[in-house]
């Protein structure tokens, strides 16, 4: 763990896919082919983030096209998220116009010709992600992608109004409209383990999904705090706590840490209840295996997110003042 990083007790083993180096080469080639990275200097900057390592940690058993998909979706997310760090992200109308074009790529009839490279890349990803999945999963994933994408409009409005959300509103926004719901769907896709419909909506599985979602979101908030603060972005739980409670930085960090510990503990207490749940519902053994595999994917994501956020150069502070430009690959 690099010096200066907040540390958390994440009681899951740290793992990384042994094919991550080759996966990164394929991933960077895809980013260049999609027009998301242009030129050798941009590629060198991007590689310093260890971009494929996050997918390799989340999907430590994946191979081939499955691993590539996982890495490519993360890479697209970095580029899409950073796109709104510029002028578009402070203009709700521009943001809405851009986001609506991205959402349109989820339509089976969508033609990406002439679209922005981010939307062309998203169309490619959605075709690859959705193809082997059930219609039920696809409908759920469309809803989650749409919620995530349209949340950028809310964030742009907040930036324009210089609005800081309440703690409760922020946690709800992160839970419903952050990148995590699409990533939880991605776990099912890459691990080839679709959660059986009868158990997906149960309190036990929803608790596991919720605690995974919030754990990863807020660990990310803590470890990216300096970068986001330097950029003037108020959408970070530590900053929200400080603003609402008029607390010190250390007090806000301590509150965030307690939340993360509680979510981790809840996950650990809930997981052992799954076999009995499946027994009560009469879930076939093959479907139980899919559920257990998806939950292992959640555990790998919780740990992998923490490890990668702590090791990547993406969250280094590139803007010592509020006027300088960040060193990014875009």
From Swiss-Prot:
A motif (DDXXD motif) lies at residues 81-85. It is an enzyme of class 4 (lyase). The keyword Acyltransferase does not apply. GO terms for molecular function: 1,8-cineole synthase activity; magnesium ion binding; terpene synthase activity. Its cofactor is Mg(2+). Mg(2+) 1 binds at residue 81. Keywords: Lyase, Magnesium, Metal-binding, Plasmid. Coiled coil: none annotated. Mg(2+) 3 binds at residues 220, 224, 228. Belongs to the terpene synthase family. Homodimer. The Asp-Asp-Xaa-Xaa-Asp (DDXXD) and Asn-Xaa-Xaa-Xaa-Ser-Xaa-Xaa-Xaa-Glu (NSE) motifs are important for the catalytic activity, presumably through binding to Mg(2+). In vitro, catalyzes the formation of 1,8-cineole from geranyl diphosphate (GPP). Can also accept neryl diphosphate (NPP) as substrate to produce 1,8-cineole. This is 1,8-cineole synthase. The lineage of its organism: Bacteria, Bacillati, Actinomycetota, Actinomycetes, Kitasatosporales.
């Amino acid at each position: 763990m690099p010096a200066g990083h907040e540390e958390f007790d994440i009681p899951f083993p740290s793992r990384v896919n042994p094919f991550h180096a080759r996966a990164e080469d394929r991933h960077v080639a895809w980013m260049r082919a999609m027009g998301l990275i242009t030129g050798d200097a941009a590629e060198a900057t991007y590689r310093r983030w260890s971009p494929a390592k996050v997918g390799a940690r989340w999907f430590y058993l994946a191979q081939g096209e499955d691993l590539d998909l996982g890495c490519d979706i993360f890479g697209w997310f970095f580029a899409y998220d950073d796109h709104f760090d510029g002028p578009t992200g402070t203009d709700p109308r521009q943001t809405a116009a851009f986001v609506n074009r991205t959402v349109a790529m989820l339509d089976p009839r969508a033609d990406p010709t002439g679209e922005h490279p981010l939307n062309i890349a998203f169309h490619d990803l959605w075709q690859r992600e959705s193809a082997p999945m059930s219609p039920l999963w696809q409908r759920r994933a469309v809803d989650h992608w749409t919620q995530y994408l349209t949340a950028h409009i809310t964030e742009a409005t907040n930036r324009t109004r210089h609005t800081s959300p309440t703690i409760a509103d922020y946690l709800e926004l992160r839970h419903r409209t952050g990148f995590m719901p699409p990533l939880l769907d991605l776990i099912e896709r890459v691990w080839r383990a679709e959660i059986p419909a009868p158990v997906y909506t149960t309190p036990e599985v929803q608790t596991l999904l919720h605690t995974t979602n919030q754990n990863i979101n807020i660990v990310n908030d803590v470890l990216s705090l300096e970068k986001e603060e330097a950029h003037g972005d108020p959408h970070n739980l530590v900053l929200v706590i400080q603003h609402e409670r008029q607390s010190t930085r250390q007090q806000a960090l301590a509150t965030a840490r307690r939340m993360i510990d509680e979510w981790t503990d809840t996950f650990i207490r809930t997981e052992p209840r799954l076999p009995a749940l499946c027994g009560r519902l009469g879930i076939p053994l093959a479907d139980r295996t899919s559920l257990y595999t998806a939950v292992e994917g959640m555990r790998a994501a919780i740990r992998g997110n923490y490890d990668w956020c702590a090791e990547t150069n993406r969250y280094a502070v590139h803007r010592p003042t509020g006027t300088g430009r960040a060193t990014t690959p875009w």
